[in-house]
Structures are given as structure tokens and as C-alpha cells.
């Protein structure tokens, strides 16, 4: 049962199984929602087929259930949302808020990676072209409920970024904004690696005239080399055995109260304890090395 208007979400891409870093994002968003007696949704962001691993989406859902992170309602699949994205693109085009761009990637790289608006005043058609937002509402800073005021890179914030790729795929920033609005998400809790695109997403909310959600960016889990745990650098998948010691490690990583005698608790009892004692203010803001799971019983 829920009795608040809070709606959170966890939105993994099916590019591989969940790892400890993924669990931090899932658990943090889950606890933030449940502590406010809110709704917690799951969305599978499967709009980039070349990056997807066959069977990964089903595995991710099984992993969430194995770790006791049960979501509300049906899972939303981005691969089934193309019509909504097309409608959003069409509306932006009709309002004169987007344009076609034929600039090759090599040209943008020569510019230092920030697009200069070269095609903004040209009249390209859709053939062999990407679609860029005509930036009208650059967001130079935003409030993070954990980190406070975050300043954006002015060049990045002002850029006419891509919302529909030349290869026909929808860009992440467009899809995530359309779907978070559709699902009524009131706060997005995710990893700090997504701080940078937040200002682009907030500018899209302004372009559409939609109310934006709040944001919380959790610390990243790092490997021993100091790199973010990710599927790209072959982070090990979550253990398939007893989930409790891994959950305890994740709670410690998030700066939460130690769970005394967790060995005597079920997964459900452990998570109820975590919800009851959840404190966002205790979460650290700096990235940290992934703790060894074998130390969970200390």
C-alpha cells in the first residue's frame, strides 16, 4: 500500500546483468521510494539494440526479485514506446524547436566535442540526418537532494544536442524524459555518472512545458583501479546465492545504519529494516571502491 504521491524508478539497460554498482542505484532508489511510502517502478531501457545482450532483460528482472526489490505495476519497455517518442519528435518539429543535422561526427570532434549549431539555420531534410534540439532553455544549474546545487558546463548546457540519431534510433535524453513524464516520476535516484546529462533532460522538460522531477545522484562504486563498475569494464554480475550479505554491503556503501544480526533475518525483514532506517543525508557523495562481499559478516 502507498499513501504518498512519490513515484521513483529504476531504469536499467539490458546490456548485461546487474552488478554491485547497479545494485547501489536500484537499492537507493527503492529505499528512497519505500521510505516515503511511495511507488517504485521498473523500466527496461531497450532502445539501443546494438548494445543489448540477448536475455539480459529477463535476467535483470530475476535479479531484482532475487534481491527482494519488487516493483509496482507493470515493467515499462522502451522498445514498445516508439510511437510516443515519434509524437514527441513531431511536436518539437511543429513548434520549431528542432532541426535536421547532417554534420559528421568527425567535424564535431574537430570542434572539441561540442556542436556549434552549424545546421541550425539550414534547411536539411530528414535523409541521412540526425535531429537536434534547438536549445531555447539552457539549464545552467540544478538542485540535487543529496549534493545541493550543481553547476553545469555552460557549453554543454547550451548545446543543441541530438534527440534522434542518424541511424534511426531515439536518443537516450529524449526517451528518458518522455518516459519519466509518462510514468509520473517525481524523483529520479540514480548514479553520479548521470549528473552531466541531467541539465539536458531538464532543458527538454522546459521545451515540452512539463514539470520536472527532483534528482538524487548516488555515489559510484569503483573497481580496484578506480574505474566505475560497469558492464563495459566487465564488472562481475551479482551473486546468485544468498542476497543478504550483498545487501548488507550495499547498505554500508550507502552509509546506512548497520543491520545487527542480519543473518537471522529474511531478505524481506532486512529490507523492511533498511526502509525504516533509511537516511538520505547519511549517503556519502564521493565514489568508493566496491567492498569485498566476503567481509559482509564482519
Swiss-Prot record:
Any one Gene Ontology BP term: tRNA modification
UniProt xrefs under InterPro entries: Glu-Q_tRNA(Asp)_Synthase, Glu/Gln-tRNA-synth, Glu/Gln-tRNA-synth_Ib_cat-dom, GluQ/Sye, Rossmann-like_a/b/a_fold
Amino-acid positions noted as binding L-glutamate in the UniProt annotation, renumbered to this chain: 9-13, 45, 172, 190
Cofactor(s) essential for the protein: Zn(2+)
EC number of the protein: 6.1.1.-
One Pfam family cited in the UniProt record for this chain: tRNA-synt_1c
Tagged with keyword ATP-binding: yes
Location of the motif 'KMSKS' region: 228-232
Cofactor: binding details: Binds 1 zinc ion per subunit.
Binding positions for Zn(2+) per the UniProt entry: 101, 103, 115, 119
Domain of life from the UniProt record: Bacteria
Family: Belongs to the class-I aminoacyl-tRNA synthetase family. GluQ subfamily.
Name of the molecule in the record: Glutamyl-Q tRNA(Asp) synthetase
Organism: Salmonella choleraesuis (strain SC-B67)
